[in-house]
Amino acid sequence: YRTDRNDSLLPPSNVSLYGDVSTVGFYLLGVRGNHLFPKDKYRLNYNLYFYSFPSLYWGRGYDNGANSDNESDYKRFQAQVKVDFMFRLAKNFYIGPMAIFDYIDGRDFDKPELWEGMAARTTNTSLGLSLLYDSRDFLTNAFHGYYLRIDLRFSPAFLGNKYAFSSTE
């Protein structure tokens, strides 16, 4: 869809429903999109998804991980909402804040003792900054151009996070 039908140079905005399923029990369902404001001065990018898959866990630390007898099955469920609002600084260059919320739930543990009292459920709230260079001719199926992005993500304890961390992607 287009936010300004009179601007033929503005790439169309988009929204997509996506999913995946596998024979081992993995499934994923999500919605993602890019809303380009008139004259491409601002961009709203979003991605919401949830998935579940069977996984393996050996316990915390090297010694537990090196012990093949510790291999245990569990089911992991995760949901994430990620939103960023970008401001155009120069042609093809954007910067803006982002927010992320994660919900993770472990279920059906074969060996719950390996978790050493860790909660089966956790949430995480993050704030951050995104830097973007995007010269693609078409956002969803580019023929020309470049897409370079750096996300700085901070998940401090004062946002209610039990496991505070930061990351760069």
Q: Where do the protein language model's features map onto the residues?
A:
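Hydrophobic core residues within well-ordered beta-strands of beta-rich domains
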Residues: 79, 93, 125-127, 146, ...
